[in-house]
């Protein structure tokens, strides 16, 4: 059975957002696990990973609610946020490629 129109897009968007929610929960869980076992000593790194996990989880929930309810404003907000995240990731990737390893180590420290 083939789905067409918005039904197929809705199902694909719901599945994608469920995967994003699982990734967000995984990030939060791994950060808590690493902190509990003492694998990572920097609270800033743990906090950053948890913040990214929570952000991803919230955005995925917004996308899932928008797709299920066919809420156009929420889907537009979701699209804008994902576009900004893409631009941010692209900028960080270009920055990482532009500097060498010694400068990267200096920035991290």
Swiss-Prot record:
Its main location: membrane. Disulfide bonds: none annotated. It is a multi-pass membrane protein. The keyword Transmembrane applies. Coiled coil: none annotated. Belongs to the tetraspanin (TM4SF) family. This is Tetraspanin-31. It comes from Sus scrofa (Pig). The lineage of its organism: Eukaryota, Metazoa, Chordata, Craniata, Vertebrata.
């Amino acid at each position: 059975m083939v789905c067409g129109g918005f039904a197929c897009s809705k199902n694909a968007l719901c599945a994608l957002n469920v995967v994003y929610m699982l990734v967000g929960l995984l990030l939060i869980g791994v950060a808590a696990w690493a902190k509990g076992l003492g694998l990572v000593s920097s609270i800033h790194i743990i906090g950053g990973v948890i913040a990214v996990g929570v952000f991803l989880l919230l955005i995925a929930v917004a996308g899932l609610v928008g797709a299920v309810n066919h809420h156009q404003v929420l889907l537009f907000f979701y699209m804008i946020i994902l576009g900004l995240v893409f631009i941010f990731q692209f900028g960080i990737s270009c920055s990482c490629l532009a500097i060498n390893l010694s400068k990267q180590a200096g920035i991290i420290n």
